[in-house]
Amino acid sequence: MTNTEPNAQGVPADAMRRLAELEPGKPGSIFTSDLSVNEFLLVREAGFKPIGLVLGSSIYHVGIQIGRWGKNQELETLSQAMYHARELAMTRMEAEAAALGADGIVGVRLTVEAREFGNDVAEFIAIGTAVKGDNPPPGGGSWRNNKGQPFTSDLSGQDFWTLIRAGYAPLGMVMGTCVYHIAHQKMGAVFSNLGKNVEIEQFTQALYDARELAMARMQAEAEALHAEGVVGVQLNAHNHRWGGHTTEFFSIGTAVRPLRADHEIERPTMVLSLDG
């Protein structure tokens, strides 16, 4: 009888067996990857070898929190649920990469998919390609981040190559989330604005506040990694199944650190073909 119990990070035993069968570094071993051909070649050119496709999953029941009809407010219970579910998926993906002895994970995709197990049930999935550096970073040390974990990055293979060539390295994906209830307008305000071009300040302030909260939380994660900055930031809004007045604002990007003082890359040169 096979053991199907997950390990301490929640990674299933079947996943650990799959990773063990890859045997990275041994003669005849294979790798798996969701990189395109161009991305794969550029990651190799940057000095990293793909060693395996890694993923993390969390099927999460998101609880209920009701916002006041006429008040702009963060729904902290829902914010915490969305953050924790994504964090579980990311942690399990990182655990798979660590089991392979990877230095990092590139091309990470983090998605949310509604499931039919219930109205408030969703699967949070993190997937990417684990890689290992051919050599230590310039100046020595490790490609892993200051927490000793494999770095994570949602940059494409092309952007990853450019980042490394320019003298930077990824530290980790950083994110911030805020689920916000946007107040309903009073009937008098609705009628007073009929036929007018006018800013609805109540809505403007709600969306502004929610995005700022998400951005601030992402920046705090980057500071915890001692990053110099965050690149490739995406700021998205998702209604999920909460209705039109409750929205999740989600900010995500890749925290980076410098590898050297010089951050210039070679300028492209023009090549004139002698073929007819």
Residue map of PLM features:
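C-terminal functional regions that serve as terminal interaction/effector modules
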Residues: 198-201, 220-229, 233-264
